[in-house]
Amino acid sequence: MKKIHPSAVIEEGAQLGDDVVIEAYAYVGKDTKIGNDVVIKQGARILSDTTIGDHSRVFSYAIVGDIPQDISYKEEQKSGVVIGKNATIREFATINSGTAKGDGFTRIGDNAFIMAYCHIAHDCLLGNNIILANNATLAGHVELGDFTVVGGLTPIHQFVKVGEGCMIAGASALSQDIVPFCLAEGNRASIRSLNLVGTRRRFDKDEVDRLSRAFKTLFRQGDLKENAKNLLENQESENVKKMCHFILETKRGIPVYRGKNNA
């Protein structure tokens, strides 16, 4: 059963799933698609061609789907946001719609946890199980792989790609691509280590050991791309292959490796 406060504004044409709750003074635009069991809390705004998956929560004064902060954007362009299931979008977060420079949509996978005051700009592509801590900000066209965690107060430069399973420490500033399963820290961020906490949560000991050996082979000595090419030969671990292919395909470059004890 839907529960819609009398002061909420639901534009004609909005599609609302079963058991939706829309609280006081919330706004839902005409082209939106809201899934089942979604809660839109007081004062939140859902705009443009936005889809929000089942069992999601949009907290007070978050704005999802407003036009991109891109001077080349034209109002007549098809533009929107697609968010998967089980998303949590906390207070005052902003998620802008896409542009014609992408496919017109900013996309976020399932199980996203986007904390207060985060900003996700136009055309960003976020995988599943992403966590953005308070005030993390993503510029246009940023890509985050599955299971990535971005610490609070961390900006990420436009077009940067962060691989699967990475941890970006709080108050860092990221301007280059980060290899899957790595931990990055600093302003500008450098690669510090394998993300051992994240990998141990997801993989068995043998796979974590393979990733640890791969990290040492890739970063401790020699040319990074040559190391990646050599490591790919007869490589059986799919996760190690992901690391190597990412290095070989990077467009913005990989930041230098600095161990945990090096500033």
Swiss-Prot record:
Its main location: cytoplasm. Gene3D superfamilies: Hexapeptide repeat proteins, Udp N-acetylglucosamine O-acyltransferase, C-terminal domain. Pathway: Glycolipid biosynthesis; lipid IV(A) biosynthesis; lipid IV(A) from (3R)-3-hydroxytetradecanoyl-[acyl-carrier-protein] and UDP-N-acetyl-alpha-D-glucosamine: step 1/6. GO terms for molecular function: acyl-[acyl-carrier-protein]-UDP-N-acetylglucosamine O-acyltransferase activity. It is an enzyme of class 2 (transferase). Keywords: Acyltransferase, Cytoplasm, Lipid A biosynthesis, Lipid biosynthesis, Lipid metabolism, Repeat, Transferase. GO terms for biological process: lipid A biosynthetic process. Involved in the biosynthesis of lipid A, a phosphorylated glycolipid that anchors the lipopolysaccharide to the outer membrane of the cell. Belongs to the transferase hexapeptide repeat family. LpxA subfamily. This is Acyl-[acyl-carrier-protein]--UDP-N-acetylglucosamine O-acyltransferase. It comes from Campylobacter jejuni subsp. jejuni serotype O:23/36 (strain 81-176). The lineage of its organism: Bacteria, Pseudomonadati, Campylobacterota, Epsilonproteobacteria, Campylobacterales. The gene is lpxA.
